Design a protein with these regions (language model features):
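Short acidic-glycine-tyrosine-enriched beta hairpin
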Residues: 139-160
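Short glycine/proline-enriched turns and hinge-like loops at secondary-structure junctions
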Residues: 123-125, 142-144, 163-165
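Conserved short histidine dyad/triad with adjacent acidic residue
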Residues: 94-97, 101-124, 152-157
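Glycine- and acidic-residue-biased ligand/ion/polar-headgroup-sensing regions
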Residues: 114-117, 124-139
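Ligand-binding loop in jelly-roll beta-barrel domains
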Residues: 156-181
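Positively biased amphipathic helices and basic secretion/translocation or surface-docking motifs
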Residues: 3-7, 11-17, 21-83
Length: 195
């Protein structure tokens, strides 16, 4: 998994303990399979090189903020809470925080949308996964609340999430390709926004 997908899965599992149990079970099976594999011979030189590489790995001692309302994987990744984020304006009622950029247009970012905001109509060239961290939104007759993921498949047309009017909504988003905004102004702004 990419860094973006791994964080999405870990954050989603925080909201669903039954998924955490399945992952622990699958990791146990993986461990059993590795234990039963035939060992591969390795030269002393390569073994020493591997140990040196391990010794040279950076040590990260990130401790999430005690006051963080975020799931632990995301709090550790952000090294804090949502209150510390410097949001960047995307458009009326919409803000983003870019977190990670991979190859071929893969991006991990946070979206903050004011209550009652309509996301501009757009099409998807690649997969998009949106995990609700706070608040809620709906797309047609589907409603997404905290801990739920919406998966927008490549080729999805006329996608327009609408933020519920109760409170602002914050989401963790993975996009695998740029979106196509329908509005002319949106397309003009898209290079500046970076989506």
């Amino acid at each position: 998994l990419s860094e973006a997908h791994a964080l999405m899965v870990a954050t989603h599992c925080h909201y669903h303990p039954e998924l955490q149990e399945k992952i622990i079970f699958a990791e146990g099976i993986g461990g059993e399979l590795m234990e039963n594999m035939e060992p591969t011979p390795i030269s002393n030189q390569r073994f020493d090189e591997l140990l040196t590489e391990i010794d040279n790995l950076p040590i990260e001692n990130k401790v999430p903020s005690i006051n963080s309302s975020l799931p632990n994987p995301l709090a550790e990744y952000l090294d804090g809470s949502l209150d510390q984020i410097k949001w960047r304006l995307m458009g009326p009622g919409l803000y983003q925080k870019k977190l990670w950029k991979g190859q071929n247009g893969l991006k991990l970012w946070l979206l903050k949308a004011r209550k009652g905001t309509k996301i501009p109509i757009h099409d998807h060239k690649g997969l998009e996964m949106t995990l609700v961290l706070k608040g809620s939104y709906h797309v047609e007759d589907r409603h997404y609340t905290t801990g739920m993921i919406e998966i927008a498949e490549p080729g999805l047309k006329n996608h327009q999430p609408k933020i519920d009017k109760v409170e602002d909504c914050i989401c963790l988003v993975v996009t695998e390709a740029p979106i196509y905004l329908h509005s002319f102004i949106g397309r003009l702004m898209q290079p500046l926004i970076g989506l």
